[in-house]
Amino acid sequence: YEIPLRLVGSEMCIRDRLTGDLGQPISAYSHGMKQKLAIIAAWIHDPKLIIMDEPFVGLDPKAAHLLKGMMRELCDVGGAIFFSTHVLEVAEKLCDKVAIIKGGRLIRSGTMEEVKGDDSLEDVFLELEDASC
C-alpha cells in the first residue's frame, strides 16, 4: 500500500521529511515512521476526539515535541485526547485529567491536581503500586 500524495497535508509529515518515503510500501517503514503515519491519519480529518495508545513510542525527539504541540493545540480549541502512556512526566505536563489503571481496574482518577497534589505523578503512581502489592 502507498499513501496518496493528495492526503499529505500534515505539518508533521512535512517537517519530519516523511514525504520522501511516500512511494515506499508501508511495510518497509520503520516503527517510528509507521507511528508518524498513524498520527497523520488520526489528525488529517480535523477530529474533535483522538484516542491513542502509547503515541510517543518510536518517535524521535523532534516528532515527539511536535506531537505534544499538536495535542495541546487540539485541546486548546475544545478537542479531547485520551492516551495511554508509561512516561508519567509527559502525562503530567500534557494532561488536565488523569486516570491510573492497574490490572484493568481504575485505582485513581481526577484532575491532575486532585490526583497528585503536591507530589509528582510518578511518586503517586509508585505509592499506589506499593499499596496494591
Regions found by a protein language model. Give the residues of each.
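Conserved ABC nucleotide-binding domain
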Residues: 11, 15-28
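Catalytic Walker B motif of ABC-type/P-loop ATPase nucleotide-binding domains
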Residues: 50-54
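A short, surface-exposed alpha-helical micro-motif characterized by mixed small hydrophobic
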Residues: 91-93
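ABC ATPase "signature
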Residues: 109-110
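Helical segment within the ABC ATPase nucleotide-binding domain
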Residues: 65-77
